[in-house]
């Protein structure tokens, strides 16, 4: 077969914006016209002569944008800003670019709506760089960081693939993205905090090359799979934690829809606000858990029954705020030490109605405790 040879008017250009290893390279070519077909020849020249490789035909589309310089996204898109529902981006992006991207997703700088309906974003080859204006109220871009509120309140967003060199995902970077179903975490991420209000989120995937995090059935864990860090709100029903889990991170199950949790007895640590505002109805805490931290079940408006293990020694402030508790089962023979607001609630007080079940013969200890004695119904009860 005859090889196609570039014509006299073909442009010869040395391109160096490439990445990759031995055997495969990725070349980024900018300033191409949208919806245009290009013919590209690899060309090399040395003292021994020159060579031209086989022609590659490539047609640009209107859903892929390559930035040569940070801050130029708005000018590249011009009047087509709100025409995109899916988009692949590459190149450097600063605060101006990310503010423009938020407009495409339906949000102005002042959080008012725009006509934008961008739903699917591939940012694999994007480099987030400091500079430019804010992307939100007093929020400025840092190098390699998905900042707090970057995707906040973007109702149309369903899927996002993050840049491969991102190192940090701040708390609530995706807050209130109510259509977001899937997030892909790249290998480079070493610091990550969850986002609240992602009611449709069912799947958090992590690159197998990431040495800090992992994912099992769409749930974000640490690399050793001993700590749950982020449980997707969109998962429903019953959830049994893997037997390898020994701890739950701060706010890991916040606002989740699971009603029944089965926690392994070898778990020894639960983070602050771990189940805050979730739909849990009944929970049996692990036998080895020593402390129930601040706001563990705060805002769990369906939680009625809590079972506390024999090794629990302390309960922190507002652990059960706004919970309509009817029964607390405590296996500890001595009353766990409680902070002064351990059972304080902004809702209807449960101190007069909730029954505290304690080990046989131990009711007197609880009735004599400065905090536990606030409950009007404490009884020795061997039932579990």
Predicted regions and their residues:
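Extracellular/surface recognition and adhesion modules
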Residues: 1, 42, 58, 87, ...
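Short, surface-exposed linear motifs at loops/turns and structural transition points
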Residues: 1-62
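Structural signature of tandem-repeat unit edges
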Residues: 64-68, 85-93, 111-144, 154-168, ...
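Leucine-rich repeat
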Residues: 75-80, 103-113, 150-151, 346-348
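Well-ordered, non-membrane alpha-helical segments in soluble/globular domains
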Residues: 96-109, 142-147
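Short, aromatic/basic amphipathic alpha-helical patches
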Residues: 100-106, 138, 340-347, 364-375
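Consensus positions within tandem repeat domains that build extended binding/scaffold surfaces
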Residues: 147-150, 170-173, 249-252, 271-274, ...
């Amino acid at each position: 077969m005859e090889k196609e040879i570039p014509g006299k008017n073909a442009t010869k250009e040395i391109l160096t914006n490439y990445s990759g290893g031995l055997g495969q390279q990725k070349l980024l070519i900018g300033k191409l016209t949208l919806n245009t077909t290009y013919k590209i020849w690899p060309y090399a020249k040395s003292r021994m002569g020159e060579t031209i490789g086989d022609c590659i035909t490539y047609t640009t589309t209107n859903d892929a944008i390559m930035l040569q310089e940070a801050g130029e996204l708005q000018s590249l898109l011009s009047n087509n800003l709100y025409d995109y529902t899916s988009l692949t981006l590459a190149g450097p992006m600063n605060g101006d670019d990310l503010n423009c991207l938020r407009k495409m997703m339906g949000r102005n700088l002042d959080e008012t709506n725009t006509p934008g309906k961008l739903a699917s974003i591939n940012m694999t080859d994007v480099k987030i760089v400091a500079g430019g204006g804010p992307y939100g109220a007093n929020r400025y871009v840092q190098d390699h960081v998905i900042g707090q509120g970057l995707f906040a309140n973007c109702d149309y967003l369903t899927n996002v693939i993050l840049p491969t060199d991102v190192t940090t995902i701040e708390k609530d970077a995706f807050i209130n993205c109510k259509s977001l179903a899937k997030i892909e975490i790249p290998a480079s991420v070493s610091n990550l905090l969850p986002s609240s209000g992602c009611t449709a989120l069912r799947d958090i995937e992590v690159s197998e090359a990431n040495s800090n995090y992992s994912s099992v059935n769409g749930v974000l864990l640490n690399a050793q799979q001993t700590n749950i860090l982020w449980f997707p709100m969109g998962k429903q029903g019953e959830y049994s934690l893997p037997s390898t889990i020994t701890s739950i991170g701060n706010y890991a199950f916040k606002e989740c829809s699971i009603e029944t949790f089965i926690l392994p007895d070898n778990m020894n640590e639960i983070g602050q606000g771990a189940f805050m505002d979730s739909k849990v109805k009944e929970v049996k805490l692990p036998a080895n858990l020593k402390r129930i931290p601040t706001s563990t079940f705060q805002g769990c408006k369906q939680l009625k029954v809590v079972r506390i293990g024999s090794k629990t020694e302390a309960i922190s402030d507002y652990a059960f705020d706004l919970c309509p508790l009817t029964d607390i089962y405590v296996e500890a023979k001595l009353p766990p030490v409680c902070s002064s607001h351990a059972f304080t609630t902004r809702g209807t007080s449960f101190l007069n109605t909730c029954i505290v079940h304690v080990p046989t013969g131990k009711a007197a200890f609880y009735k004599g405790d400065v905090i536990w004695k606030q409950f009007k119904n404490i009884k020795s009860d061997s039932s579990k």
